[in-house]
Regions:
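GST-like fold's C-terminal all-alpha helical module
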Residues: 80-194, 215-216, 221-226
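General structural signal for secondary-structure boundaries
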Residues: 17, 101, 123-126, 203-210
Length: 227
């Protein structure tokens, strides 16, 4: 959603359940379970990097990062995103999920995620390891932001979105986690928040199917790694 605000575009949204089954969306995607999903005409993007590129189809370089920036993006999305769930107490996480999903929804969500992570290769951090990882990440952002308003330079960009997301999630679960963050990081978070979500319009599945029918195309060529 923040990418929409960054791009300053109008878009439409259909709400789906946090976990499968998701009815119509499952039928369209043929079983791919990741959300959010971006639709442009007949094309559906289930990878956030590809989705951001699709929003900027006239400039495919928007997600091309230097080696240091790519390492920071990978750190944010692979380690820190999961670490923020271990920084706060399990009771706080359950309370957050209950407010979002209801008690029955929490049971379904935990059962779904347990099944999904059964064959995962991620290293699960202890609470202390997670706290240390997040602290190091925040400190690194502070150093980066001392040189420019945004991680991407003078204006916010793809790298800012990637690093903002896990910290936003942490604040959604428990806003107290942000209390020890240095002011320079907190101010950056506020600037990112101020981007908003663009102009959100109502839409139905009928319109989504209409867009598919009106924008049929043939995909040619080889899909590049890692997609």
């Amino acid at each position: 959603r923040l990418a929409m605000g960054l791009s300053g575009i109008a878009w439409a949204s259909i709400q789906v359940f946090p976990q499968p089954p998701r009815g119509t969306l499952d039928q369209i995607l043929g079983g791919d379970r990741r959300i959010p999903v971006l639709q442009r005409g007949a094309h559906f993007y289930c990878d956030t990097r590809l989705a951001f590129e699709a929003l900027h189809y006239d400039d495919p370089s928007v997600t091309q990062l230097g080696a240091d920036d790519e390492a920071l993006r990978d750190w944010a999305e692979r380690e820190i995103f999961f670490a923020v769930f271990s920084v706060v107490s399990p009771i706080t996480v359950l309370g957050f999920l209950a407010r979002q999903l209801g008690l029955l929804g929490v049971v379904r969500f935990i059962r779904d995620r347990t099944h999904m992570m059964r064959n995962a290769t991620l290293d699960v951090l202890t609470a202390e390891q997670a706290r240390k990882a997040v602290q190091e990440f925040i400190a690194h952002l502070g150093v980066r932001l001392s040189a420019s308003l945004y991680l991407s330079g003078k204006q916010p960009g793809y790298l800012d979105l990637c690093c903002y997301h896990p910290l936003w999630m942490a604040c959604q679960i428990d806003r107290r986690v942000a209390l020890p963050w240095p002011p320079i990081v907190s101010q950056w978070m506020k600037r990112m928040d101020s981007l908003g979500h663009g102009e959100v319009l109502p839409v139905t599945w009928d319109r989504a199917f209409q867009d598919i029918a009106e924008n049929q195309s043939v995909v040619a060529g080889v899909v590049a790694e890692p997609y």
